Amino acid sequence: MLTVKKGSKSFYVGDSESAPQAEMIFSADKDIITIEHTLVSDQLRGQGAGRQLLQELAAWVRAENKKIVAVCPFAKKELTKSQEYEDVLYHFPN
């Protein structure tokens, strides 16, 4: 299992937020966290780093009582493929 850290604008794996081996970049609004981009280095690819980043971000979102909007294709796919994240997904009004 990788060690995931929370930075000011991302959850990341590595020694620093400015030079991560993997990262999930987000922007924060009042009640909405938008996942902008996920990047995993070749060194960590295939080890579930992206999923671990998402799990940590979702746990933080739950603790903060916020919701997630995903712009990032990876995060969007992971968030909607099971019910695991249903409680943190923001549903746009019709």
Q: Over which residues does each language-model region extend?
A:
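N-terminal first-folded block
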Residues: 1-33, 37
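Conserved acetyl-CoA-binding loop-helix of GNAT-fold acetyltransferases
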Residues: 46-57
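Short, hydrophobic/aliphatic alpha-helical segments
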Residues: 36, 55-61
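Short leucine-rich amphipathic alpha-helices used at interfaces
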Residues: 31-32, 53, 81
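A generic "binding-loop/recognition-motif" signal
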Residues: 31, 40, 74-75
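A short, internal acetyl-CoA/4′-phosphopantetheine-binding micro-motif in the GNAT/acyltransferase core
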Residues: 38-45
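C-terminal structural segments of small proteins and small subunits
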Residues: 60-94
